[in-house]
A protein has these predicted regions:
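Short, cationic, amphipathic peptide segments
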Residues: 1-25
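Short basic helix-loop element that most often maps to the first helix and adjoining turn
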Residues: 28-54
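The short coil/loop that forms the "turn" connecting the two helices of the helix-turn-helix
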Residues: 44, 58-59, 88
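Recognition helix of helix-turn-helix/homeodomain-like DNA-binding domains
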Residues: 54-74, 83
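Long, charge-rich C-terminal accessory regions
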Residues: 117-264
Length: 281
């Protein structure tokens, strides 16, 4: 049995080495593989992709059955369309960029978040929206919090056959929870989202999964399936009765300082409660 295990392990390593070499010397296959991978991660089966294509890019279903078949049909226009449809980074589809998701980060400049979110609302007025605040599972928010926090914007519109289709943007890098300015900027963004009518929800992931997200090693919808729990970021703006702390007050005060620098009155977000529990469901 030991010999069988060693042989199986060796074959597995050889298979990985062959796959790496094949991708290394066949960049068109990498593009095709990533295009199919991305659509499937976003909930669109490969045989459904042709239904989404504009008339000028029409392809038969069989073209999407495998990366090897699709690579012969690739064109810059097809890849441009796929990147725009999924809101993913075009250079990642090319196998060049390290990050699959577009990143819209305005650390210490919350006015940039306000302007960008307002623009998304204007451009896609009928979508549902959700600001997700992802932190490490098991790390309670407070003075002893540790691990990274990552902010994700989700835009939900109508998909095929009455289904929902989501696009995602990363709104932060890997912000450490033990660094007060990062917590305060996170709270400021929660306040801005709330003032614009964007639902807010907190999710928890294993540390390894959070690191895969920030390193660009996993797609957001893939990690959505690996959530370990939830929490309520809006409690950092308006805590539940009897649960306020001096630490929370200091962080909210710091967040209001960043908001004021951007010409935003932090008090305007109070009294505009959103159903974060519904957003988490």
């Amino acid at each position: 049995m030991a010999i069988v295990g060693e042989v199986t392990g060796a074959l597995g390593l050889l298979g990985k080495a062959w796959a790496w070499l094949r991708d290394r010397f066949d960049p068109a296959r990498v593009q095709a593989k990533r295009l199919i991978q991305a659509f499937e991660a976003y909930g669109t089966a490969r045989q459904q992709i042709p239904r989404l294509l504009p008339a000028g890019l029409a392809l038969p279903n069989a073209a999407f059955s495998s990366p090897d078949k699709l690579k012969a049909h690739l064109s810059p226009a097809l890849l441009d369309w796929a990147a725009e449809h999924l809101a993913i980074d075009r250079s990642w589809l090319d196998g060049v960029g390290a990050q699959p998701h577009r990143i819209e980060e305005h650390y210490k400049s919350p006015g940039g978040y306000r302007d960008w979110l307002a623009q998304r609302i204007e451009q896609v007025p009928h979508a549902s929206r959700l600001l997700q605040v992802w932190k490490m599972h098991g790390s309670e928010i407070g003075p002893d919090a540790y691990g990274p926090v990552c902010l994700v914007y989700e835009e939900i519109s109508e998909g095929l056959d009455g289904s929902e289709f989501s696009r995602y943007w990363r709104l932060s890098g890997e912000w450490p929870l033990d660094h007060s300015p990062c917590v305060e900027n996170m709270i400021a963004l929660v306040a801005i989202a709330r003032s614009l009518g964007v639902l807010v929800a907190g999710h928890e992931l294993a540390l390894g999964d959070l690191r895969r997200l920030t390193a660009g090693k996993a797609l957001i919808p893939e990690l959505q399936q690996r959530r370990r729990g939830g929490w309520h970021p809006e409690d950092l703006i308006e805590p539940l009765p009897g649960q306020d702390t001096a630490w929370r007050q200091a962080r909210w005060q710091g967040a209001q300082t960043y908001l004021k620098q951007a010409g935003i009155d932090g008090a305007t977000v109070l009294g505009t409660p959103l159903d974060a529990g519904a957003a988490s469901s």
